[in-house]
């Protein structure tokens, strides 16, 4: 567990009062662990990793009262910082909780007809681990009535390929949303 704490203290000083209760010095570390890609079947998350780079996709159960309309949403970390973010949530009594955080548009996923996704459970179709990353394919066939959505992510070294597909017999307005933490640079 010490290596996890060392990673935490790369960005945060250990100056809280709680640090006095533990006399162990936990130095910051600059080395970034190389963890393998992993699938958390029970919670419906898949994590692709390549060196320090991480991509997380959420496809699983809705989560009841704590759930968000965010099937197939992703977050991306480049080893230094999060570059595609899942904003999480705020206190339940704050107006932004229902006006922003509980909206599909506040997540890095697909919005259909400017509406929120339905409470639904997605499905993992494939998960492949490679030494230099991996590949995941997940679907959310019930997030929007009549629309079958799937997302394929391929992480290979420092390159991420994101293929989002939405199929329907009817015409819809599709918004592909990425919550970026920085202004993108196009080359």
Where are these regions (language model features)?
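Carbohydrate-active enzyme catalytic cores, enriched for enzymes
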Residues: 1-84
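CBM-like, beta-strand-rich accessory domains located in the C-terminal region of large
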Residues: 1-9, 90-187
